[in-house]
Amino acid sequence: MCSKSEQAIVVNDVHAKLNATTMQHCLQPATVAEVITAVTQANKEGCVLSVAGGRHAMGGQQFVTDGVLLDLSRLNKLEHFDPELGQVRVQAGIQWPDLMRKLHVMQYGNSRQWGIRQKQTGADRLSIGGAIAANIHGRGLDMAPFVADIVSLNLVNAQGQLVHCSRQQNAELFRLVVGGYGLFGIVVTATLQLAARQQVVREVELCSLAEMIAALPQRIAAGYLYGDFQFETAPDSAGFLWHGVFSCYRPVATEPIAKQQLRLSKANWQQLLYLAHIDKAEAFSRFSQFYLASNGQRYWSDSHQLSIYLDDYHLALDQQLARGCAGSEMITELYVPLQALQHFMAACAADFRQHKVDLIYGTVRFIRRDAETALAWARQDYACVIFNLHIDHLPEAINTAASHFRRLIDIAIRYQGCYFLTYHPFATKQQVLACYPQFVEFMQQKRRYDPAQRLQSNWYRHYSEMFSEELP
């Protein structure tokens, strides 16, 4: 399994496509027993393993050079559903659309139904195991990260043993595994707490950042469940990073949902993406017109979180843009206290204009404090600011992007904020420690639970080298 293969494989992430990695083999276990066998064999042969699901992770945490990839996409069953508690046990490779479809079928005709509370937005074919590893969030207005939705999990540790983890059993390991980026064990099953499935109505307005911030507490107090603020991206606009579409979702009594509601087609999305690269003002105009026209439409609280993701959408864009090289969008997510958001966004706008940052898309979401995980990114209640930046796949352009991302982290730190660790590897050591003072302890715990460092990733290797003086 671990010997050098004559036909080594090259894997890459789906979105940024900047993590091409040569690996020796890819295994696709379909049972927990097969995962245990793979880890046991890796220990015998002395090779390293990494774990992937939907392959959207873009910071290097799902691949390891010259290692063996465990692709959990075949470990995808819904094992048990408890309609009384509203809990579901699933295998880690199941992806959101499949989970939601199975829940819908199992509950067809029931007067009380359950659905997922939150998922990542912008893409759907993401695994539950990956959601656990990254401790993801959605667009809930009053929700903590995904750890709040996890009742328990089973993992295969680095020694090949099956271990049950919850807040009551192996609690320290539970805290490390959720948001632990696959370094403390291979999650094979998880029990999730669902929420009552209910209808919501979309309410949309164009407003300023200040108006959105003022309205947010009122929306939460009134029981609105979800929402976000999608801001203008044209740097020559007076509304750049300041004016946007504020969409919220309010629970309503169940009624038949119109079959012909407005929606953006794949062709609409491809056109919007093209405009976002060449005419950002027009892209926002069309996007905001669509959202305003959809005001008042009804959705289900779970399925409204699904979205269209166009696989390899940038191949067509590369031809249209004719820049002579491949390109993609790279994501960063920054967190600041809500009271600092206006100053933070103004500083980002000035920086983007000064450095000619090519911003394609951005949104503001909200998160409640995570007091449970060891490497919590939501160390307090935050506004979450997501920027998608265009990157040409050229060394100079990537170096320029790295500078952009580091400056953004510095701006977040200036306003008592933080950043998400694994969208890119460009943070400095000082930035890591400023935002994650527990990082060295996290890495030390990794080596305590996995002294052979059987489970690795290029992300882990990068930070092991960065913190080599602090680690044994």
Predicted regions mapped to residue ranges:
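N-terminal regions that are enriched for targeting/export leaders
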Residues: 2-17
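Glycine-rich N-terminal segment of FAD-binding domains in flavoprotein oxidoreductases
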Residues: 18-121, 135-140, 364
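Substrate-recognition/cap regions that form aromatic- and gly/pro-loop-enriched pockets
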Residues: 304-427, 431-434
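C-terminal substrate-binding/cap subdomain adjacent to the FAD-binding core in PCMH-type
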Residues: 151-343, 350
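Short, conserved charged micro-motifs
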Residues: 34-37, 98, 212-213, 240, ...
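Short, acidic, Ser/Thr-enriched surface-loop or helix-capping motifs
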Residues: 83, 127, 157
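Activity-critical C-terminal alpha-helical subdomain
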Residues: 318-319, 406, 413-472
